[in-house]
């Protein structure tokens, strides 16, 4: 009997653990997003594309400590726009953006509830924009029926979006971008490392040259770092764009 109880507890623990890990990333059905899991590695792909822009829409998006999440840019896309709707995003593991089999691409993560990169969190990208837009704008970008707004997408790419003043972006870990980093939120707290321009950049690699054409005044230009907040910006860490 005692042995049976132990067996039941082991099975329950295994099943409960799997449910918890599965809840880490939850697509909401507005985009054709697929999450493939191999151990503690999560590969996230999408076939929702408009011009040079690919889209993921999630109910929840977290990266647990000890896990690696790879966000893939499909085909010839340059920009990957990720919308998270139902809860704060916590990144405590490794988050990579993959373009043509290596780190690259322009990655946007939009979450009205805030984004936190913990001490063990590392983000490796081509370029990155983190923002906390309001919920109304999120619904404009991709509607409940999956329709994509060209006008709202242009605003995302330009970094010109209405911000939720209660949304906070905090960095205690590391952001490592080959090109640029832009942060727009209600409040920003950096106690980690935000590193950009980690290799020489070529304009043709980072400017959207098809689909929705913009000049990218804020994000993804010249290996710079831009941090903007409706309220306070607190920097107790490192913000550095290598020459």
PLM features per residue range, with description:
Residues 1-9:
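Bacterial N-terminal signal peptides that target proteins for export
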Residues 8-17:
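Bacterial N-terminal signal peptides
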Residues 19-243:
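Solvent-exposed adhesion/ligand-recognition segments of exported proteins
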């Amino acid at each position: 009997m005692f042995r049976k109880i132990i067996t039941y507890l082991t099975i329950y623990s295994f099943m409960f653990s799997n449910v918890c890990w599965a809840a880490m990333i939850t697509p909401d059905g507005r985009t054709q997003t697929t999450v493939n899991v191999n151990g503690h590695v999560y590969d996230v792909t999408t076939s929702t594309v408009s011009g040079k822009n690919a889209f993921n829409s999630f109910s929840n998006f977290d990266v647990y400590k000890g896990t690696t999440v790879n966000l893939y840019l499909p085909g010839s896309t340059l920009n990957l726009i990720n919308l998270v709707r139902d809860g704060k995003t916590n990144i405590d593991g490794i988050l990579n953006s993959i373009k043509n089999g290596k780190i690259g691409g322009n990655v946007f993560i939009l979450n009205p509830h805030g984004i936190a990169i913990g001490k063990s969190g590392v983000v490796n990208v081509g370029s990155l924009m983190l923002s906390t837009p309001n919920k109304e704008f999120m619904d404009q970008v991709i509607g409940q029926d999956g329709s994509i707004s060209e006008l709202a997408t242009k605003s995302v790419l330009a970094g010109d979006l209405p911000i939720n003043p209660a949304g906070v972006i905090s960095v205690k870990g590391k952001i490592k971008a080959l090109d640029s980093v832009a942060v727009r939120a209600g409040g920003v707290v950096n106690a980690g490392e935000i590193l950009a321009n980690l290799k020489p950049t070529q304009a043709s690699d980072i400017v959207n040259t098809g689909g929705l054409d913009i000049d990218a005044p804020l994000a993804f230009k010249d290996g710079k770092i831009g941090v903007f907040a409706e309220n306070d910006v607190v920097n107790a860490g490192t913000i550095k764009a290598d020459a």
